[in-house]
Amino acid sequence: QVYGNLLSGVATPAFEGTPTRTGYVFKGWNPEVAATVTGNATYIATWGEDKNNNGIADDEETKYTVRYTDGVDEEVIFADQVYRNLLSGVDTPAFKGTPKREGYVFKGWNPAVAEKVTGDATYAATWGEDKNNNGIDDNEETKYTVTYKDGVDGEEVFADQVYGNLLSGVATPAFEG
């Protein structure tokens, strides 16, 4: 907007409306607008980037950290993945890769990963034991029982040997005796 033929000492005319720019926030004028006209002046809009489109310049916002950990104390399954300087409202960065741990299956993250960043967050991997290495949490599998009986009625040649809670694919327990 250009204002011409202004007399020295009159109030500097205000910009009509609000300057807008996609992905940015209007921060003000450079130089600062003088209260009165003292000569020719050009005022340049200054902008602050607003990646999360919340109306606050990114350089004025709190930044957050998202961390993915293996969830295992005293052992390193994988190095933490850490994402820093995240703005509120942006998509939560995903874990890169697939968590793997020998003898276990990955069950998910605790707490569940939020869709958007709202603050600092740590997500710990959760694991289910997988003794038979079939890719299924042992607690979710059907368990089997193997029983050895003497096959004699009315006489006990040997006591029944019962092996319970066996997983598919594990070695059959041997008869003892």
Predicted regions located by residue number:
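Secondary-structure capping and domain/repeat boundary segments
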Residues: 1-177
